Amino acid sequence: MAVDRKIRIAVVGGGPGGVIAALALSKSPNVEIDLYEAATAFGDIGLSLGMPWRPWRILRLLGLQGYLAALLPPDQIPKEDVTVPTIHYRKSDQAVGEDIFTCTSLSGYTRFRRSHFHAALLPHLPSNCKTYTSKRLVSYAEPSNASDPIVITFADGTTAECDVLVGADGIKSPTRASMYNYAADEAEKAGRSAEANDLRSKIRAKFSGVEVYRSVISAEQLRAAAPDHHAFRCPTQFLGKEKVRMPTYPIQSENSQFLNCALYICDYSREGEDYPEPWVTDVEAKDLRSSLPDWEPEAQAAVSCMGEVVSRWAICTLSPLPFFQRSRVVLLGDAAVRVTTPFSTFSSDHCQTLACYDELPRCRLRPGDDAYILSEILTHPAVTRDNVQKALEIYSEVRVPMSTHVLESSRRTGMDCALHDEVAAADLKSLGERMQQEMVWAWEWNPEDEKKKALDLVEERLV
């Protein structure tokens, strides 16, 4: 990377993925970074963040793990080489529930409040990284000349310039909209109308068929109704064949006197529909309390503790994207792949982040993975302002296959959690084994292998 011409990088989106990317990239003295956040303050939007083995390891590889470890008591710092029980699954749509399996994973599952996460990392941004709030991206202008800067436009009417744009701006990403509109226009001009239509269809997220009704419930109230409730021993998912599932787990708080309870209503016949705004809204809970009449007492007890009003979340997702890069613009995190549950926490998206303990391995996984690979590529000494587009092509080439796997695996596991396949649900032992197997890639696939693949391509093409 040429020292006499620094690469100006704009990171749009101040969620976990954007912050990690900015920190990792800013370690190079040959870049200048502007980090833009749409909200009035970093960490203002979103609940807690879940972190299993893979993102925890990536933070260590990036030299950032210690900042978060300082927030934890010594006995709660994850051990990367220890397998621990993480989530317990039960079939609960009957008078006496049945255990399905207990998911185990390396290092377990660590949670942080979003505000604590940002407070721990943001002070370590060096002087070559400037931060801005109340800057919501509207679009960017793709330059006709490779040497000209990218112009980005914000909702307040201001503009900025950069050499590289990193869109970490969530599932409703304006970066993705601009990128895929440019690609579609190009295909249209070349007479490829079907391709243009397909590209435009990838811009807007579609309904997954899952609505989540979320509530924070009192641990004291639940203990009075069910003193031996499974949720007090281990985060638990109660599953039912009526396409319903309910995770219940202690919420991240200073005194742990509350639990997060969520009721998932799954109708996969609606998968792929356009879901009207807003995706998140408050609704009355009275109908939910009577929605599990034949379920085991523990499940009914948890629902009975929900408040009068609950938050309804429509889980929307993206169809697989064929590329995460165009020109000198890349997509990161939910802007590139928004997976359905159960792999959808530690999200960079502001409107759609679910801090559910049932959602095991996604990074919570993907934004960190993306930031890790992108930073390793762009901080390679061979990358310059003149060849940075070729470097970004490598990022897309490496990340798309892995991200597509996560998307597909997430969908399969989400359906298993909803007992969607009645044949599979009839054999609980086999179902549990299948669900566990769908998750093991999250700690068996080493992120350093993906880094090696990326850097080998940099050496091959740019050196």
Curated annotation (Swiss-Prot):
The annotated pathway is: Mycotoxin biosynthesis
Q: What class of enzyme is it?
A: oxidoreductase
Q: Where is the signal peptide?
A: none
Q: Which residues bind FAD?
A: E37, G50, R114, D334
Task: Tell me the InterPro entries matching this sequence.
Answer: FAD-bd, FAD/NAD-bd_sf, FAD_monoxygenase
Keywords from the UniProt entry: FAD, Flavoprotein, Monooxygenase, Oxidoreductase
The protein's matches in SUPFAM superfamilies, at most eight in alphabetical order, are given as: FAD-linked reductases, C-terminal domain (SSF54373), FAD/NAD(P)-binding domain (SSF51905)
User: GO molecular function terms here?
Assistant: FAD binding; monooxygenase activity
Q: What does this protein do?
A: FAD-dependent monooxygenase; part of the gene cluster that mediates the biosynthesis of strobilurin A, an antifungal polyketide that contains a key beta-methoxyacrylate toxophore that targets the complex III of the mitochondrial electron transport chain. Strobilurin biosynthesis begins with construction of benzoyl CoA by step-wise elimination of ammonia from phenylalanine by the phenylalanine ammonia-lyase str11, oxygenation by str8 and retro-Claisen reaction to form benzoic acid, which is activated to its CoA thiolester benzoyl CoA by the dedicated CoA ligase str10.
Q: What induces it?
A: Induced in strobilurin-producing conditions (on CGC medium after 6 days of growth).
* Protein name in the entry: FAD-dependent monooxygenase str9
* Pfam families the record matches: FAD_binding_3
Q: Which domain of life is it from?
A: Eukaryota
Q: Where is the active site?
A: R200
The EC number of this protein is 1.-.-.-
Family membership noted in the UniProt record: Belongs to the paxM FAD-dependent monooxygenase family.
GO process terms (BP): secondary metabolite biosynthetic process
Biotechnology and industry use: The structure of strobilurin A was used for the development of the major class of beta-methoxyacrylate agricultural fungicides since its beta-methoxyacrylate toxophore targets the Qo site of complex III of the mitochondrial electron transport chain and prevents adenosine triphosphate synthesis. Compounds such as azoxystrobin (Syngenta) and Kresoxim methyl (BASF) are among the most widely used fungicides worldwide. This class of antifungals are used as effective treatments against a broad range of destructive fungal plant pathogens and make significant contributions to food security.
